[in-house]
Amino acid sequence: MASKKLKYKTDFDKCVLTDNFAARGWTRCGDKDDDDWNIYWATVWNVRNIFNPKSGIRLNDMQIINHFPNHYELTRKDLMVKNFKRYKKELEKENSPYCQKDENGNYLYLDFIPQTFTLPGEYSLFVEEFHRNPNATWIVKPASRSQGKGIFLLRKIQQLKKIGGGTNSNPLQAFSLKEAYVVSRYIDNPLLVGGRKFDLRIYALVTSYRPLKVYLYAMGFGRFCNEQYTQDIAEMDNMFIHLTNVAIQKFSDKYSEKHGGKWSLQSLRYYLEMVYGTDMANKCFDDINNIIIMSLKSVQSIIINDKHCFEMYGYDILIDENCKPWLIEINASPSLTVTGKIDKELKTELIKNVYQIVIPDDWNDDSSKTGANTSTQTKVGDFNILYDEAQEKKISQQQQQQKKNINSKTIWK
């Protein structure tokens, strides 16, 4: 263990955080204004304040914090879409191999976000697409809210009056610019288990953006709706059918406190193997890995890569009936509230592993080990390295050198 007891600060009184701090013998800062901490698990608002140049706060080499300064470039729904569209154009311009398409003209590696428009900026584009597919269902979400708040399904343009006022001819005429929205093509053919819709919550830990280094947690889970899935228009407003958020589902009469409407990721993978076969299940999870890497790369150049920062993202992935995964959203502050014994065990181990990566046991013994990206391990608990750009470049350089040596031997034999 570290030779000196470390101090922590947290804005969240969640047992999975505080119990893990206590287990490592760390001391909690007693006052909310106490800045003598080594690790701070903060709200996104306090992180923004800390990195605001006007705050006058300067973190020292022995301080790390759980968000990058402009994390919202990835975790705000509208900015996530905007940044990925920009990144896709950059790859196309470079004629990147990631832009390969199948025989139907669909991207092999970049087609994982449902068609999405931002409102009010892309309202006209949305209307054009809406009229091209008049029978499609769309889902409308506030860009910066979470836990399913403010979400509704849409089949008629006039339904946008819910968020913008306006008239039937122009529902966004009086749209408030105080809050942005996204409207996405609703995935109306989700894979069902027992007739119910579900999505996956998968955790990814980023310790550096340049070079990109990301760990993937093996023990995610599926979140289930409590009601049987249907496309019946009469049930469009029934969020117990359409939204998997626990914050929504816990109000259903069918909600179980025992399991919290969750299945382990391993159980869901076994289910996929049983229904689709091992090869398709493996491809599905390979595609999920690709989604995580490509989404992070889409903001790699614009995230402020402060060495004091790390970020644990909660990815929400929906699998359709063709075993194709779709990225629904990325959460900067995935819920650490526990919904039962198994959920508590999973999240306790999750946070324990995060601490082991960002502050390894020798972190305080070695003055050269500062910042959140000091661990050299490829596996820590249930976290495994998903992508290590520095290592990838090193291997690439070694392969290029080997190729040069081979060429030299061929020429000078």
UniProtKB/Swiss-Prot annotation:
Kindly state one GO CC term assigned in the UniProt record.
ciliary basal body
The record's top EC class is ligase
What are the UniProt keywords, alphabetically?
Answer: ATP-binding, Cell projection, Cilium, Cytoplasm, Cytoskeleton, Ligase, Microtubule, Nucleotide-binding, Vacuole
Q: What is its EC number?
A: 6.-.-.-
The keyword ATP-binding is assigned to this record? yes
What is the annotated localization of this protein? Cytoplasm, Cytoskeleton; Cytoplasm, Cytoskeleton, Cilium basal body; Contractile vacuole
Classify the source by domain of life.
Eukaryota
Family statement: Belongs to the tubulin polyglutamylase family.
Which protein is depicted? Probable alpha-tubulin polyglutamylase Ttll1
Q: What's the source species for this entry?
A: Tetrahymena thermophila (strain SB210)
Q: What is this organism's lineage?
A: Eukaryota, Sar, Alveolata, Ciliophora, Intramacronucleata
